[in-house]
């Protein structure tokens, strides 16, 4: 009999991606953040997600007042620049959860056949991601929805830079009410520092940002929260060390 863990990992994207995309789109239309974490708890408790190993990470940006500022394409390259007036960022890693309010800012989405770059820049948050994937043609049209599996990723914020060879799914949903949902699911937390691969992972406080004091007024039923002065990659790195 074949290894059940290998079978679960093989068919995990087929199980998660369609369900995840439909549920996130439905949740995005609902203003109750508690439903989001209920969905995350359901997914994390499924047999496929219960395989021993690093936990799954969920990052969700919910933005409003979104407008397209610039869009241009080349035969093998596409770039879109968005502006938004505000929103929120939700995270769930293992038993921890967090939701921060975001001020207005800009989004840059660059797409090639093998790499997709995502940069979110506002006064309360800056994060940049690069996702490596197989040939995938993005159709960036208004009111579009897409889910793109990736094989590895690189991320940077004002306090840290990480890369990981674990895969996941990037989803972008744009609605006709000037709103957007960007979700990132990472199937594990085995991460490395590009600038130093020989030394042990530093303690989390070395990656703590004192740059911002975000509001944490998004409702959540979870009792545990990340500290308010951590950046996205700092949180991922901290939980990777404890995985």
Curated annotation (Swiss-Prot):
Per the record's keyword annotation, is DNA-binding included, yes or no?
no
- Record's superkingdom? Viruses
Gene Ontology CC annotation, any one: host cell nucleus
Which Pfam families does the record match to this protein? Answer: Herpes_UL4
The places in or outside the cell where this protein is found are: Host nucleus
Coiled coil stretches, renumbered: none
Q: List the disulfide bonds.
A: none
Residue spans with biased composition (Polar residues)? 205-219
UniProt key word Transmembrane: no
**Which keywords does the record carry?**
Host nucleus
Query: Which residues does the annotated region (Disordered) include?
Result: 193-226
Family classification? Belongs to the alphaherpesvirinae HHV-1 UL4 family.
Q: What is this protein called?
A: Nuclear protein UL4 homolog
- According to its UniProt entry, this protein's organism is Varicella-zoster virus (strain Oka vaccine)
């Amino acid at each position: 009999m074949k290894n059940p863990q290998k079978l679960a990992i093989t068919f995990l994207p087929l199980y998660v991606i369609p369900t995840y995309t439909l549920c996130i789109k439905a949740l995005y239309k609902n203003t109750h953040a508690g439903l989001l974490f209920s969905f995350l708890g359901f997914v994390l408790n499924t047999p496929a997600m219960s395989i021993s190993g690093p936990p799954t990470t969920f990052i969700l940006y919910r933005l409003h007042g979104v407008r397209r500022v610039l869009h241009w394409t080349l035969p093998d390259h596409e770039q879109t620049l968005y502006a938004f007036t505000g929103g929120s960022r939700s995270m769930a890693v293992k038993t921890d959860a967090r939701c921060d309010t975001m001020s207005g800012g800009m989004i840059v989405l660059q797409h090639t056949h093998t790499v997709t770059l995502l940069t979110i820049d506002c006064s309360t948050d800056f994060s940049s991601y690069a996702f490596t994937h197989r040939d995938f043609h993005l159709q960036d049209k208004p009111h579009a929805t897409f889910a793109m599996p990736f094989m590895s990723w690189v991320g940077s914020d004002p306090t840290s830079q990480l890369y990981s060879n674990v895969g996941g799914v990037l989803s972008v949903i744009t609605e006709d009410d000037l709103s957007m949902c960007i979700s990132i699911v990472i199937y594990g937390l085995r991460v490395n520092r590009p600038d130093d691969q020989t030394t042990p992972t530093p303690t989390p406080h070395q990656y703590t940002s004192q740059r911002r004091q975000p509001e944490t007024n998004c409702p959540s039923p979870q009792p545990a929260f990340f500290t308010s002065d951590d950046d996205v990659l700092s949180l991922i790195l901290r939980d990777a060390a404890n995985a």
